[in-house]
């Protein structure tokens, strides 16, 4: 495991703390060996609808990023995750394109880095860039294959190897660092919500090929994989050298088409992982929530309670999906089922700020009982449906 990192910045060598994963699957800081805890958001402005919508308004995308990163920082968040739209970053063979999407991603990373916000990059989505509009053809390799063929078609696998290798070693001109060498980038998730259709042997072989492509760059950062999809091959995930496993949670559903009403605290009492006591090596890989959200509600009482439950289940990285860019948040056109922005949903945003404090202070693995007893937890945290309150 990594113990330290030596990073050259502006001609000076300095030792910068990084994240490593120990033999028990725990993320730790290299300088203190203390456990790490990250809480933050997904945010998509460099890509897809958010990118286009800022263009429709004829606004400066980098200025928009500046405002949003400032607000994200004000909320006390220290984590950022994104699934890159590979269709906007690649050609048909998986070669990384030097285009505006990559430039904006590089710029965003640099701005997050300035505010000590750490990053996990999910390298590919393997789906289109349209939602909620129509897909726009780009020539990217993922448009050539069905998502459920991406992990078995020989040419698709070869394109992914090319892409992952190019992405991980890409040098960010705003930081002067390759992604693989930037201490602010905690690690890489191979893909977003994979759709496997092969045998356990084939799935394991696919993951090992992706790991080889990444590691050939000299990467020593942790690599994560989604284990909450394709449960029939879950053992294969744990038989590979991935160091982190990823999960999501939408406890009250998605895309209801209306604002939901009611007390949803009983829905989030527990986060059960059905194979936690069945799969060999489960406790040897760190656990990350790549996406979560109590969707389609405007209440302010849910976020700290969800963090409480995630910490009980052993998660060290928790990122909500998704933070709305301020310049388009007034219309909530990006993901209508999700709505979070400091200026336009201030009560939910403050709940996120309180949740960030909970993520930092609550001990991993500690239980707080069941509802309603668990509405009081940690050192003075409280949530209430009747008061619509987080504190």
PLM segments and residue spans:
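Bacterial Sec-dependent N-terminal signal peptides
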Residues: 1-12
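Extended non-globular C-terminal regions
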Residues: 390-391
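Substrate-binding cleft of secreted/luminal carbohydrate-active enzymes
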Residues: 296-375
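Glycoside hydrolase catalytic-domain groove-lining segments
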Residues: 223-224, 232-296
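Flexible loop/turn segments at secondary-structure boundaries
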Residues: 89, 129, 232-233, 253-254, ...
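Short, flexible/disordered intra-domain loops and linkers
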Residues: 53-58, 94-96, 200, 255-264, ...
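Active-site mouth of glycoside hydrolases
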Residues: 16-242
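Well-ordered, non-membrane alpha-helical segments in soluble/globular domains
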Residues: 65, 204-209, 264-273, 300-305
